[in-house]
Amino acid sequence: MKLAVFVSDYRLNVDTLDRLNPAKLGIILVQNGVYHATAKENGKSSSLLEKKADYYALIDDLETRGLSSTDLSSNVKAISFGDIIDLIFNEYEKTAWL
């Protein structure tokens, strides 16, 4: 299964993601979830970004929080709402929201 997971909070959801075992995992960071892609604690990125997955962050939510695509970790791609629709319909079979 190809699964896209929306992460909308900065609290860690790693244990839930560990229970999901899709063939392909996409993590779409929205709302406060975009902080996973930009914040560093003690010089270290969020442990969420250690998963084997494709990572995306919604541009509008970055900008709302005073951030930009240049603030993102190197393994996270900035995307628009239209890109999210394309991902859901073309790349992934199921979606979940954490």
Describe the function of each predicted region.
Residues 11-13, 33-36, 64:
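Short acidic, S/G/P-rich loop/turn micro-motifs used as interaction or catalytic elements
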Residues 1-4:
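Extreme N-terminal starter segment of soluble prokaryotic enzymes
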Residues 38-40, 65-69:
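Glycine-rich, charge-decorated loop segments at or immediately adjacent to ligand/cofactor-binding or catalytic sites
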